[in-house]
Amino acid sequence: MRKKYLLLFLFVLFASSAFSQISKTHYIPPITSNGSTAAYIGEQWIYISTPSVDQVVFTITDINNGSIITGEVKNDEPYSLLLSSDESSSGLVTPISEVGNTTNSNGYVINADCPIYVSVRFFATTSLYQAGAFTSKGSSGLGTHFRTAMMPMGNKTTTNLASDFTSYVSVMATQDNTIVRATLPNATASANIIGIPGFTPGTPLEFNLNEHENIILAVNPEAGSGNRRFALFGALIESVDASGNQDPTKPVAVTVGSGNGTFSESTGGRDSAVDQIVPIQNIGHEYIFIRTEGDDSRENVILVADVDGTEIYISNDTTPTETLNAGEFIIIEGDKYDGSSSGASMYVRTQGDSYPVFAYQGVGGPATPNQGMFFVPPLSEDAQDDIDNIAQIHKIGSETLSGRVSIVYKDGATIEVNTGEKVGGTYSYTPVDLSGITTNTVIGKPGYKTYQISGLEGDIQVKSDDELYVAYFNISGAASSGGFYAGFATPPAAAISLDLESLGACVEFDPVSGDYVFNGDGFKMNNPD
C-alpha cells in the first residue's frame, strides 16, 4: 500500500544506517607491498558485523577474478573470511611492480541487504612481525576531494629510513569514465614515484578509470633519500570531469598506507599502517586524540591543511603552533598529549570550520615495533552512532591479540561497553565494568571525556546517548592493528518527503544519485539538498 509522509526528523532516526561508515555498500581499494621479508603480507581477512538481529545477506565481489561469495551475518553471528594466505595470490594486494601508470582491477566490493560494518585485517608472515587493519568507511568514504598522509619515517627534520619502506595511495573508481587527478605538492623531481618515470613537480597526474578499476601511487625512499618520504604527503586526490572540475557523479574511494614503516625518528621498530580515508565534506576543524601505549616518538598526530592560512591550535593555546597552506602538514609529537600514559588526550583545532584539516594518528603498543595509524573523525554533533559490533576484536584469523578500545564521549552521557560471545551454543553480551577505569577530561574542550579500555576479547558493543567516537586497537608481540568504527557522519537534510512502499527498514544515502535508498530496490526518497 503506497503512503505519503512528510518527515521532520533528527539525525538519530537513521544514524545507524544512513549517515556513517556502517553501510550497505563498501569499496575496498587494494593495498601494496614491496615484498620484503619483514613486511611480506601473509593472511588477509575480511570481518563483517551488523546491528541487525535478523540475517543480512551480503556478497563479496573479488574484482580481480570476478568471483562472488554470498554470505549471511547477524548481530550474534559476525562473519570472517580468509581472502588469501599469501600476497602473491591475493585480490587485496597489488604487487609493487604494478603500481604507477598501470591500471589495476584488484580490491573488493561488498554489497548487503542492510547496513554492515566491514574491516580488513592482515599480518605480515606467520611470525606476526607486522600487522595492519583498516575499517571501510562505507558511503562516508566516497567523494571527490581527499588529502593524504602516512607514516613519516621520522619527524620533519630527522629521518629514520629503511631500504624496504614503502608508502602508497590507492584509489578505486565507482563509475565508468572516472578521471582521477593527483596533485603532489610535496614531491620533488627526485621523488621517485614508482612506475611514473619523468615525474614533473607541480604537474598533476591524471588517470582514466572504469568502474572498480584502481590506481596506486607509491614511493620507496631509501636511506639517504629522505626528501622522498614526504612525496605523497598532502596529495590532493580528486575525481574530475573533462573540464577539470570536481565531478560529484563519480566519487572514488581512497586508502593510504605504509609498509615496514615507523613514526619514530630514533627507534628501530617497524610495522604496517593503513586506513581508508574520507573526503573533504566529512572532515572538520576540531579533533580529540587519545593516546595509546607508545612513547612520544610514536604517538604522533599528522594534520594536513586544505586551505591556505590554516592555523593549528593545540589544547587551550590561543596562539597557533603553526600556520599551514593547502597541502602542507604538521607532525605533532606525543609530548603534546596531556599525559604520558595511555588514555591521555590531545585537543587540536583550527581557527574555524572554513579551515578543515585531514587528521591522522600514529598509535603504538608497549614494544617499539607496535605501531599503526588511524584516520580520525572530527568532532560533530551528528556523530551519534552506537557500535554494534566490532567483530572479534582480538583476532586476525587464528592469531590472538590483546584488544583495546579508545572512546571519546560527552561529559554526562551514559556509556555502555559489552563483550559478546557464544558459550554452550548461546550467544550473550556481558557488560564491561567501567567503574575502575580512569576517565580523562579533555583540556581545551570542556564537556568531553575519554576512556581507554584494554584486555578485551570477543565482539564489542559500545553505546552512548550522545556523541560517540570509537576506535579499536590490538597488539601481539611486534604487531598491531586497528581503526575507527564510529565518528564519521554526514548530517541529513532537515526535511525529507517520502513516497514509499513498505519494503523493509534499511535506509541508506546514495552519494552518486543524492537519494536515500530503501533496501536497494523499489523505493527512494529525494534529498532536497
Residue ranges and their predicted role:
Residues Q21-G520, N527:
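Intrinsically disordered, low-complexity linker/terminal regions across diverse proteins
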Residues M1-S23:
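Bacterial Sec-dependent N-terminal signal peptides
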